Amino acid sequence: MKREDLLIEPGELLARLGDPRLRIYDATIMFYMGMSAEEAAKMPTGREVYLGGHVPGAAFFDHQLFTDPIGKYEYMVAPDQMLAAQIGESGIGNHSEVIVYASSLLASATRAWWVLRYAGVENIRVLNGGLPAWKEAGGTVEAGEHQYDPAPFTAAFKREMFASKEEVQGAVERGNAYIEDALMQDWHDQEHIPGAACLPLTDLTIGWDLLRSQDEIWALVAARPKGERVITYCGGGIAATLNAMAHLTVGNENVAVYDGSLFEWKGEGLPLSSNNTGA
């Protein structure tokens, strides 16, 4: 895939704002690293940030509605029938042109992109730079909530985008895939899936919102064998989607996200490796 098939720049969206074919979604997730649960509970949620100001006409993409309600691990994608129904309920049809973005953290938007594309939404792009870049380009914001009318949607799942725990176990044992950790290097050094390389999502972005240039991304992923199966993972399947998109922009088409990521891997008591001395 080409970069322009995956990303839309703010100027293009500005020129097309109001196009009735567009379905725009704010997929913001707010993470409060270093805070206690009690402190984080007092901070704004993604929905509250959206309500305070968003791209005009954008609806809110509530990640929880696309998540398995009885799954053991947070953010794992919903079962097929539920996912397809929720996509249609959100206003996305098979011929919709979808734009997703985030107020902060590009990976929040790429998670929405990955979920929707996995289910068969073909025409979907991520706003590069998110809401900060939109404002910088002269875009206005509006407060309050917007919703789209439901639309008929028939799923056509792209199973190759999804890596299960069993596939990752097989890759660890047989070495038949390139496993890539999207978490920070110091976290990776502490613990990671055996054999995994580390490419922190922050290496792929400027700040938290803007995907680096094509040349910069190519330099970062050049060592990854082109054509070989690439499986990206992180803590809970969010950051890993940004790495997966980055691979696609430079032609590494055989890339999947380990949806359960470390939440599932550690929760199931599977082996971990460490780079720390004495570990």
Each PLM stretch: what is its role?
Residues M1-A279:
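Cytosolic catalytic domains that perform sulfur/thiol-centered chemistry
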